[in-house]
């Protein structure tokens, strides 16, 4: 059934890829609530779209323009969200850099901090047992 419909549709356009785009747009319209132009018996929207194109009940150029507009909207949304992600990422990087810098400054200034004692001593690579004995020696 669909093979005959595709062969009939090739009379409207000589490009199979364009036919797929046209049928996809019409099926999208039908799924969104558009009324079918031809009568059908419980067919799927993709088959109905192909039958409408084959029956020359649709303006192929306007259908193609709708598909291009839908693609443009999607791409604009995608590009805008990508730019927003890059902007947010740069803001996050700045905040993370400030947090890291302030954390290192706090470690160096706080002598009661265990991390500051560890970083300030020569026994950085020693075992925990050796660190405990060297802390009591000081």
UniProtKB/Swiss-Prot annotation:
SMART domains xref list: RNA_pol_Rpb6
Function: Promotes RNA polymerase assembly. Latches the N- and C-terminal regions of the beta' subunit thereby facilitating its interaction with the beta and alpha subunits.
Name of the featured protein: DNA-directed RNA polymerase subunit omega
A Gene Ontology term for the protein's cellular component: DNA-directed RNA polymerase complex
Record's keyword terms, sorted: DNA-directed RNA polymerase, Nucleotidyltransferase, Transcription, Transferase
Encoding gene, per UniProt annotation: rpoZ
Subunit structure: The RNAP catalytic core consists of 2 alpha, 1 beta, 1 beta' and 1 omega subunit. When a sigma factor is associated with the core the holoenzyme is formed, which can initiate transcription.
Organism this protein belongs to: Ehrlichia canis (strain Jake)
Tree of life domain: Bacteria
Annotated segments matching region Disordered: 117-138
Taxon lineage: Bacteria, Pseudomonadati, Pseudomonadota, Alphaproteobacteria, Rickettsiales
EC number: 2.7.7.6
GO molecular function term, any single one: DNA binding
